[in-house]
Curated annotation (Swiss-Prot):
GO terms for molecular function: ABC-type vitamin B12 transporter activity; catalytic activity. One of its GO terms (biological process) is cobalamin biosynthetic process. The active site is at residues 329, 436. Pfam families: CbiA (PF01656), GATase_3 (PF07685). It comes from the Bacteria. Signal peptide: none annotated. Residues 251-444 form the GATase cobBQ-type domain. Catalyzes amidations at positions B, D, E, and G on adenosylcobyrinic A,C-diamide. NH(2) groups are provided by glutamine, and one molecule of ATP is hydrogenolyzed for each amidation. It comes from Roseiflexus castenholzii (strain DSM 13941 / HLO8). Belongs to the CobB/CobQ family. CobQ subfamily. Keywords: Cobalamin biosynthesis, Glutamine amidotransferase. The gene is cobQ. PROSITE patterns: GATASE_COBBQ. This is Cobyric acid synthase.
Amino acid sequence: MTAPVIMVLGTASSVGKSVLVTALCRLARQRGLRVAPFKAQNMSNNAAVTADGREIARSVAVQAAAAQIEPTVEMNPILIKPEGQRRSQIVVEGRPWRTLDALDFWRRKEMLWEIVTRNLDALRARCDLVIAEGAGSPVELNLKAGDIVNMRVARYVGARCVLVGDIDTGGIFAQLLGTLMLLEPEERELVQGLLVNRFRGDPALFEDGVRILEQRSGLPVLGVIPWFEDLHLPEEDAVALERGNRLARDGLTIAVIHLPAIANFDDFDPLAREPGVTLRYITHPDDLSDAVAVILPGTKHTLAARRWLRERGFDVALHQFPGSIVGICGGYQLLGERISDPLGVEGQGGDEPGLGLLPVETIFSAAKLTVQADAVSRAPWAVGARLHGYEIHMGRTRSIDADRPLITVTQRGADAVEEHDGHISKDGRVWGCYLHGIFANDAFRRGWLQHLGWHPGEELNPSTDPFDHLAQHVAAAIGEKQVRWLFDIG
């Protein structure tokens, strides 16, 4: 039997589609359905690594976790990773395919559509329900001829579509009614209901708004979802950072340098969730003044990021910075003595001196390592802590001085190994490694924070599963009757 598809469409980018798909995946799973997320094409430098070493969008991997299944490439067959200068690396079925500009990508849409349908068919064959996510708006009329992620997917599977608007940004009537108006008649017939997301205050105050939307659209408003203050799920892309430091709070301050083509910045979400910790994304050295630590995150363009740091004045500022300095993946490469790209892996290639804060050198190769990994910490604040995360990089880094590894990798994919990774300075102040997800380990994260002078205070009660918390929030707004109607389970 082929699984039916529910599709969450949005009136624009960042209206909450990804989070709502996450919630629906958990709600479906709670009701006994074998459910899987799907997004035909995603644009983000936040990638996750599947068990077989493939890349998919981090947001889709989070949705799979909500569905309580392993993420696979069928859930996100095309991933677009922007590299700057209007070019992007295209990841197809979890493997880097080629780097294209927008026009080249557009010309290959029909070939990519075959990949989309093949993977969606495979996913539907092994599930009870697929919950698909659109991208941006389904009525970008100048782009619609090349659509492989919104209404073309909906038409292909006859999806039951839900259209979501963000009332917090204003213009909810124009968002929802305008989008419906611009859909083709056969597309509009697929839309089964509307959702109003991110309402601040008492939803009862929007009862007139619900009536107006239903009268003018002829569709039910399935729910008015209140603003969710305690959403502890990764943001999808750097748009979230451009909205400001929404995770910041009073207390110990950690600065994250917002590098060009920043990638996998959800590495630092566990830090921001700790009480008494402020996480601040910065672009200027002056913003380091009250920080006790600074983190250099991953980036799709390490050499370009190196030049950017020099131009912004970070070289001098980081050498004078008295606190802890950390690099993850590309950030680790930046902390070293030299970065070389003889094959032009990152574009034009070249050779740059690093920041000179760790005695390591990096050389890029054509082979990309994407793998889940287990490791053991050698850091003085968390000796022996068992870590789990993933590696995703094309550079290879070696120590050129006394070898002081930060971690020992014990498993890469299915292979047992014993390999050192990363480096830590003699005084423990500067360190870096390739392992994404290192801060998700409680012992490592809290040990490092206490090393910086953090005092956790009274131990908080263990929080509920964030997916259950989110699902409960959405179900309360929609109602059980509507949830079961949406899933067609009576």
